[in-house]
UniProtKB/Swiss-Prot annotation:
Main localisation: cytoplasm
InterPro entries reported for this sequence: Amidohydro-rel, HutI, Metal-dep_hydrolase_composite, Metal_Hydrolase
Residues reported in the UniProt entry to bind Fe(3+): 78, 80, 247, 322
PANTHER family xrefs: IMIDAZOLONEPROPIONASE, IMIDAZOLONEPROPIONASE-RELATED
Residues binding 4-imidazolone-5-propanoate: 87, 150, 183, 250, 327
Gene3D superfamilies xrefs: Metal-dependent hydrolases (3.20.20.140), Urease, subunit C, domain 1 (2.30.40.10)
UniProt-annotated binding residues for N-formimidoyl-L-glutamate: 150, 324, 326
Location in the cell: Cytoplasm
Lineage, uppermost ranks: Bacteria, Bacillati, Bacillota, Bacilli, Bacillales
Keyword Hydrolase appears in the UniProt entry: yes
Listed name of the protein: Imidazolonepropionase
Keyword set, alphabetical order: Cytoplasm, Histidine metabolism, Hydrolase, Iron, Metal-binding, Zinc
Organism: Bacillus cereus (strain B4264)
Known cofactor(s): Zn(2+); Fe(3+)
Length: 423
């Protein structure tokens, strides 16, 4: 007997087409079962099909979804989840046209977050991150990547990673940990970036032994770390058994996309300034292009990543919030879906695949997350929507009704749902 049977699902978005990364037309294809049903037993999906095919199945709990849509839990593959403080005091300065470097000189910018993170205890960081994780869950996210990077020293980086490890044990959302010690060059290492990178590399053996990070990341950008420094750093991390990511070409076409493809990074992230050659190399690689349009939007920039071109050229594109206190303070992955549709010229189908299938591969979870398939864990979202296009179309709010994590209800809107409303 099943534990739970979901029936009367108007659109069941299984996302279950070919295995592996989705490109080109596959990104624009959504496997949908009309009038679907899903069976769950011991936290695992044991039945996927039509309501007609589900007749005769017995379950301890039968949930009538009222003709609404069900999808896999969403995957957010790029966040800076664990940090201290906030930076709302900088908004007025930015609106007045104060340059970022001047804000830095006043102790603001990333330095403000670094200082606040250093001052916070591990438990304070954990409790703050739980608040943000709860919000992510309420937007339908069941798997998330979380980076360190607000320490720029060994003690605080360890603290962030240990906070992430505690969150992995205490919160229902699955968390994939990334070490981003090479987020910036500290003032005391100005002009000595290679020495700083060596310091960060020296932390990796113990980090691997304690299993505090699965990925290593670096910020490859003008004035931070060069392409050659980034490649050398990440290749050494790979030699130690880590998978790697790269903050690439966020501002300038520096060659970060090319470097990511060349070294076999799991993902290259941002890519606003990626060159034509970089896009071509990504298309011919297994590196996911994780685009972060919410950051471009919040920074009030005119030029967004060329998502349409990337998909047309054959790049496997994912979307993420880039949740962080400075350049994208939002946990709302649904808002990112809307911005991607409007500013990256992605179709609703491409957007959905970019927050499920491809985003799961960006963090090496393609075999466990992002699809509704028999044998996979029951990470599911019931939406207050009757078709998939409605979610990115009606922007700025959450359309989530209920989230199941490993077959258990982890979030529900409860009586506030407009279940009887007509769209």
């Amino acid at each position: 007997m099943l534990d739970t049977l979901l029936i009367n699902i108007g659109q069941l978005l299984t996302m279950d087409q070919e295995d592996g990364l989705l490109r080109r037309e596959a990104m624009n294809t959504l496997p949908v079962i009309e009038n679907g049903a899903v069976g769950i037993e011991n936290g695992v999906i044991t039945f996927v099909g039509t309501a007609e095919e589900a007749k005769g199945l017995q379950a301890r709990e039968v949930i009538d979804c009222g003709g609404k849509m069900v999808s896999p839990g969403l995957v957010d593959p790029h966040t800076h989840l664990v940090f201290g403080g906030s930076r709302e005091n900088e908004i007025a300065l930015k609106l007045q046209g104060v340059p970022y470097l001047e804000i830095l000189e006043q102790g603001g910018g990333i330095l403000a977050t670094v200082n606040a993170t250093k001052q916070a205890s591990k438990e304070e960081l954990v409790q703050k991150a739980k608040f943000h994780l709860d919000r992510m869950l309420s937007f339908g996210v069941t798997t998330v990547e979380a980076k360190s990077g607000y320490g720029l020293d060994d003690e605080t980086e360890w603290k962030q990673l240990e906070a992430t490890a505690q969150l992995q044990k205490e919160h229902p959302v699955d968390i994939v940990s990334t070490f981003l010690g090479a987020h910036a060059v500290p003032k005391e290492y100005k002009g000595r970036s290679k020495e700083f990178l060596q310091w960060m590399l020296d932390l990796l053996p113990e980090m691997k032994e304690k299993q505090l990070a699965e990925f290593v990341d670096i910020f490859c950008e003008t004035g931070v770390f060069s392409v050659e420094e980034s490649k050398e750093f990440l290749l050494k991390a790979k030699e130690l058994g880590f998978d790697v990511k790269i903050h690439a070409d966020e501002i300038d076409p520096l060659g970060g996309a090319e470097a990511a493809a060349e070294i076999g990074a799991a993902s290259a992230d941002h890519l606003v300034g990626a060159s034509d050659k970089g896009i071509e190399m990504l298309a011919n690689s297994n590196t996911v292009a994780t685009l972060l349009p919410g950051t471009t939007f919040y920074l009030n920039k005119e030029s967004f990543a060329r998502g349409r071109k990337m998909i047309d050229e054959g790049v496997a594109v994912a979307l993420a919030t880039d949740f962080n206190p400075g350049s994208c303070p939002t946990e709302n992955i649904q808002l990112i879906m809307s911005i991607a549709m409007l500013k990256l010229k992605m179709t609703p189908e491409e957007v959905w695949n970019a927050v499920t299938v491809n985003s799961s591969y960006a963090i090496n979870r393609g075999d466990v997350a992002g699809k509704i398939r028999v044998g996979r864990k029951a990470d599911l979202v019931l939406w207050d929507a009757y078709n998939y296009a409605y979610v990115p179309y009606h922007y700025g709010v959450s359309h989530v009704n209920t989230v199941w994590k490993n077959g258990n209800i982890a979030y529900t809107r409860g009586e506030q749902s407009w279940s009887t409303a007509t769209i």
